[in-house]
Amino acid sequence: MERWISPGRSLGSVIAVIGALLVASAPASAHGDSRGHGDHGVVRAALPSGAVKHIFVIELENEDASTTFGPGSPATYLNGTLVPQGELVENYYATGHASLDNYIAQISGQAPTEETSADCLGPSTNLNTLIGSYDDLLPGNLDPNQRLYPGQVDGHGCIYPAFVQTIANQLDRLDPPNPFTHVAAWRDYDEDMGNQPTGRELGTPDPLGGLDCAHPALNGPDNTNAASPATATEPADQYATRHNGFVYFHSIIDNTAECDANVVPLGKVAVGAPSWFDGTRLPDTFSGHLVNDLRNPWTTPKFGWITPNLCDDGHDSTCAGPNTVGQIGAGAGGLHGADEFLAHWVPLLEASPAYRLGQMMIVITFDEGNSGDGTACCGETPGPDNATPGFSQLLAPIYQQLGLPIPNPASGGGRVGALLLDPRYIEPGSVDTTGQYNHYSALRSYEDLLGITRGGTDGLGHLGFAAAQGLTPFGRDVFNRPFRRFLWR
């Protein structure tokens, strides 16, 4: 599907480029203090709005920065190839434990609740099936203390009411979806989504395979927490609803046509085999939504989110289905599996016209660190419904069943690190040891960079805790490359 291009877009793009030329060399502090006219001193990302036209986030699972990027890391492609191409932000932090709350935070600024911190598992969850819940968050009202809890919603449950906005809704207002195809300026790509449509999740059959906007029945059980091996008629399904933050908002799932058009399966890669001639690996062959969207800058979404399956994101060490290169079972996942995913899918992004033109930033990070790391940064405060974002007391009985020590109450999700790739604005091979950022900082940065400067919790384009006073978005320590004329790579 082609993305909707509003009339006059080309003129706006020219103006944005001229603006970038004028301000790229303007002085700024190391921590992004660019201030727009009329912004009342709000701290914004160091680059001008519109300088980065496309942002893609690849979300991996459950590793500390010291393990991922340290000596002896099994992520050899990440460290040996990608880190030299971009900037490693060492002090990047998750905002909670376990998974779901971090996915939600990065697109909405909503803080962990007891339920989202527990991945919507309950104290009586059967550890053999890991069946969770997909329940509305009730009562779902704005917290009365908006000074302390900006944009935060009170309640218990997992699915936010329709008035709670995400960066997807913000982009819909800024750049309305195509009125015929409903394709928007954002897209969420989920590997394996709908591989086994019978009994795991509900959705609309996608013409390219899988299901669109796939999630459990509202207020019903969630059967996707554990991967499902292949059957006689269906491939393995390693999609986990809890790793798809977009389907936890009624503002997205209630608009069926738009959700179907934009919450889509990632697609497939056929890994190139060694050449019979000289043994060099032949090119990979891709199919599906992502490769189709990347063919032109005007079909590439402004904001793209990529969630690998439970093996390829590193969550599962022993995999019920194949990783990117076809390995199954013990050792197929973990950082090794995540690294194989990056080794094949990141080159696809980097080969896209949008990236080669210097218009795209790629962010590779992790939802959370290991459960023993509950550190936080950036003045993170808990939300109104969970005083300890680093651990939900709903999980205590499960820890006891497993014979594991119950973690101490913690304030965050640990130091996970992030790698940012941008051929125009980031110096290859650089390491940021001074900046401190978290998932809320990232959301604030995405909003600023993509031109979302109105609305939101603060009226200046920032949602939830991304609007927290004093929160720092990506600054000159991140966008550290001196401006130069950029040519097609």
Regions inferred by a protein language model and the residue ranges of each:
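Secretory targeting and sorting signals
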Residues: 2-31
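N-terminal pro-sequences and low-complexity stem/linker regions of secreted or lumenal proteins
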Residues: 30-489
